[in-house]
Amino acid sequence: METPPIVIDNGSYEIKFGPSTNKKPFRALNALAKDKFGTSYLSNHIKNIKDISSITFRRPHELGQLTLWELESCIWDYCLFNPSEFDGFDLKEGKGHHLVASESCMTLPELSKHADQVIFEEYEFDSLFKSPVAVFVPFTKSYKGEMRTISGKDEDIDIVRGNSDSTNSTSSESKNAQDSGSDYHDFQLVIDSGFNCTWIIPVLKGIPYYKAVKKLDIGGRFLTGLLKETLSFRHYNMMDETILVNNIKEQCLFVSPVSYFDSFKTKDKHALEYVLPDFQTSFLGYVRNPRKENVPLPEDAQIITLTDELFTIPETFFHPEISQITKPGIVEAILESLSMLPEIVRPLMVGNIVCTGGNFNLPNFAQRLAAELQRQLPTDWTCHVSVPEGDCALFGWEVMSQFAKTDSYRKARVTREEYYEHGPDWCTKHRFGYQNWI
């Protein structure tokens, strides 16, 4: 009997990996860090750093492209051959194992070819299927997790939220697709907002419509950098405190539920106090509980009060001009992508938007996106945005593991025999590349 495929969501910030039969993936940071004393820390060992100031990072991905396999191979070895840290998971050797992996959309052909060579020749996997995460998202008919579908029209919100059957979309097309013989949804607009950037990818019949793919150069890395500059200007110099600021971003930031101006009027109500680390009782700091304001803090405690920073930083998704970026926001990018699709499928795509990526863990992001997009659409169109109820960063791996159980996967994968027979150029051009679809 064939062994279950190994699924690797090779994100630029974090790798999610594990057998497709697992309910949840293992997680490992996709980076190498060096502290101010010159000590290097690989992947999850970064979490053991006590003095987090002046940490420098080196990542295998540059501008969203996997360019440094010398480092990525070390991180993969740490993930695949380290049973002591990952609950006994050990690949032992690649032979007899199959791989389902993600790669960045629009990966350069030479870089994609290099990845094939490493996977087949160094790790010796028996077969490979790789694709952008957006390609796996339509294969969610048997997805066991909970999805929350948000309507752009106010009168539909309660109905859609209360409908437990609307797991992935609510349009009539999607319901018909669920009853059809295919193992995927025919029309979906996938928004993948990750560490490096945000991709808008229309998927028709399980294949990305590359002519309409759009990229927004705002992601988790950008938000962390902008927050560092803002806090350094208003409070303390935090330009070398990447780990601390990233933690503040993940714990505190949110997207304005209605509009930036409404949140700005009530910014004092949303204000939070963040206690900076003293490296004795805390190494990352923490948000001060407003219910425990009477509890005395240590005498040397340093506190920063966060007011409009909480929602101004994520607002750059909708208004990049806030950070002096003269490019369209996420709503304009979606509209531009829709304009490049065949006119007949545009309402179907709008009614079947699926969000994935760690940035959608920001509270109110999906709701605000649905509301802002609905205002720009024709009145007879209804925008439906689906977002996972759990950790959005894990949704990519979960749909990949669902895809690994379908007949489509077994038909589309490339075996090691095919790779050695046809060569890496054939794999890139005819199976894993995007050139033939443009």
UniProtKB/Swiss-Prot annotation:
One of its GO terms (cellular component) is cytoplasm. Component of the SWR1 complex which mediates the ATP-dependent exchange of histone H2A for the H2A variant HZT1 leading to transcriptional regulation of selected genes by chromatin remodeling. Involved in chromosome stability. It comes from the Eukaryota. This is Actin-like protein ARP6. Component of the SWR1 chromatin remodeling complex composed of at least ACT1, ARP4, RVB1, RVB2, ARP6, YAF9, VPS71, VPS72, SWC3, SWC4, SWC5, SWC7 and SWR1, and perhaps BDF1. Pfam families: Actin. Keywords: Activator, Chromatin regulator, Cytoplasm, Nucleus, Transcription, Transcription regulation. It is found in: Cytoplasm; Nucleus. GO terms for molecular function: nucleosome binding. Residues 163-174 have a biased composition (Low complexity). It comes from Saccharomyces cerevisiae (strain ATCC 204508 / S288c) (Baker's yeast). Belongs to the actin family. ARP6 subfamily. SUPFAM superfamilies: Actin-like ATPase domain. CDD domains: ASKHA_NBD_Arp6. PANTHER family: ACTIN (PTHR11937). Present with 238 molecules/cell in log phase SD medium. InterPro entries: Actin (IPR004000), ATPase_NBD (IPR043129). Residues 158-181 are annotated as: Disordered. The gene is ARP6. GO terms for biological process: chromatin remodeling; regulation of DNA-templated transcription.
